[in-house]
A protein has these predicted regions:
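The conserved acidic donor/metal-binding loop of glycosyltransferases
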Residues: 73-77
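Short, flexible, basic/aromatic active-site loop/helix in glycosyltransferases
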Residues: 120-145
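Short aromatic/hydrophobic "clamp" motif used to bind/position activated sugar donors
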Residues: 69
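Short beta-strand/loop segment that forms part of the nucleotide-sugar
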Residues: 17-26, 45-47
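Short, well-formed alpha-helical segments that are part of the catalytic scaffolds
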Residues: 1-13
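Glycine-rich, basic loop-to-helix element that forms the pyrophosphate-binding segment
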Residues: 46-64
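A conserved acidic beta->alpha catalytic loop
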Residues: 8, 24-33, 49
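Conserved donor NDP-sugar-binding/catalytic core segment of glycosyltransferases
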Residues: 79-115, 120-123, 127
């Protein structure tokens, strides 16, 4: 997945406002070697053991110490200028704690993706919830959000 998706993150990153950091959560595949040999501009934080999904992210966020952290799974591609509006919104709205971009389906980019209920709204506590999904149907992206 790294070879398929990470290039879009590297190519579409604005290095004036963000570093690309891959956190390896104790993987047993060759992810660390791929990052070191094929993605020289990417920073690598490698844990010796797998701390699980939430604890792995939390440890990385604490250790990296950035003002903002943006979490992407390894199966996410991004488009040009995806990051700037999120950053600008956070900078201009200090009372906002979380933002997310529009998330589209990888198999059909005219539809939203709702993996884990993301792709909709985030409530005041930072929990994502769906908008535009009714049971077994998924809303088409017509630029409405």
């Amino acid at each position: 997945m790294l070879r398929r998706y990470l290039p879009s993150v590297v190519e579409n990153n604005n290095d004036q406002i963000a570093d690309v950091v891959v956190v390896d959560n104790g993987s047993t595949d060759n992810s660390v070697e791929i990052i070191k040999s094929e993605f020289s501009t990417v920073k690598l934080l490698a844990f010796n053991e797998n701390y699980g999904f939430a604890e792995g992210y939390n440890r990385a966020i604490r250790q990296l110490g950035y003002k903002y952290s943006l979490l992407l799974n390894s199966d996410v591609a991004v488009s040009p200028h995806w990051l700037e509006p999120l950053y600008k919104y956070l900078e201009e709205n200090r009372d906002v704690a979380a933002v997310q971009p529009k998330i589209l389906s990888d198999s059909d980019r005219t539809y939203f993706e709702y993996a884990g209920a993301c792709g909709g709204f985030i409530d005041k506590h930072g929990y994502p919830y769906c908008r535009g999904r009714v049971f077994d149907s998924v809303e088409n992206d017509n630029g409405q959000y």
